[in-house]
């Protein structure tokens, strides 16, 4: 069975030595916050049409999350499931908006009362990915709670706390023979201490949606 790629820092380096971001903390659920860095390995079977073709594991290969792909006719909705198949969050794209916008809800809900956060492009025309994240209580959206910047195609995106330079998660790509010949896209995401890794996993799903729309445009 294929072993997922996991990015590892040399001992004494990497995010474990970085200060904890002030804007970190719970977005989805406290159980997804750890006092140490979390490395998540992501494998996407790009040619697969089966449910759960987007898989996220921990460093030991244990399943953390999988994505329930939209059925035909419902391409604006995806669900992030935990390892047991229970909905963690539901992601829905709002089709009518000046800037592409995604809403993320708790569990399997799409009720506005269960809105956790909203994501939108920083601008309509972008050479590289720039997304702003607004938590559910941030109604006026004058200042973002998180930012995503980088290149999805190169799998080099970084998540920042608010408008600061404090990094809360970053992505690393891994090229393998299997990724080239078997149509699998392997990369990993390092989540910094005390940052909700279910939240970061759901951002990765949105980044994937953004990229697929850009390629289809």
From Swiss-Prot:
Keyword DNA damage applies: no
Keywords from the named record: Acetylation
Gene Ontology MF annotations: protein domain specific binding
Record-linked InterPro entries: LOR, LOR_sf, Tubby-like_C
GO cellular component: cytosol; plasma membrane
Stored PANTHER family: PROTEIN LURP-ONE-RELATED 1-RELATED (PTHR31087:SF160), PTHR31087
Name this polypeptide is given: Protein LURP-one-related 15
Native source species: Arabidopsis thaliana
């Amino acid at each position: 069975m294929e072993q997922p790629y996991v990015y590892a820092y040399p001992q004494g380096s990497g995010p474990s030595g970085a200060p904890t971001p002030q804007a970190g903390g719970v977005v989805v659920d406290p159980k997804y916050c750890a006092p140490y860095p979390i490395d998540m390995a992501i494998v996407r079977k790009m040619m697969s049409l089966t449910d759960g073709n987007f898989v996220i594991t921990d460093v030991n290969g244990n399943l953390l999350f999988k994505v329930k792909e939209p059925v035909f006719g419902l391409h604006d909705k995806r669900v992030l499931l935990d390892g047991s198949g229970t909905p963690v969050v539901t992601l829905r794209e709002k089709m009518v908006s000046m800037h592409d916008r995604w809403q993320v809800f708790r569990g399997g809900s799409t009720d506005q009362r269960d809105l956790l956060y909203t994501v939108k492009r920083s601008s309509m025309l972008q050479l590289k990915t720039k997304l702003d994240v607004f938590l559910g209580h941030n109604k006026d959206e004058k200042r973002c709670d998180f930012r995503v910047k980088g290149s999805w195609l190169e799998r080099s995106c970084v998540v920042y706390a608010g408008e600061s330079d404090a990094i809360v998660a970053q992505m690393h790509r891994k090229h393998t023979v299997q990724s080239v010949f078997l149509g699998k896209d392997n990369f990993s995401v390092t989540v910094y201490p005390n940052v909700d890794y279910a939240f970061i996993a759901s951002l990765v799903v949105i980044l994937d949606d953004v990229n697929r729309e850009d390629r289809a445009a």
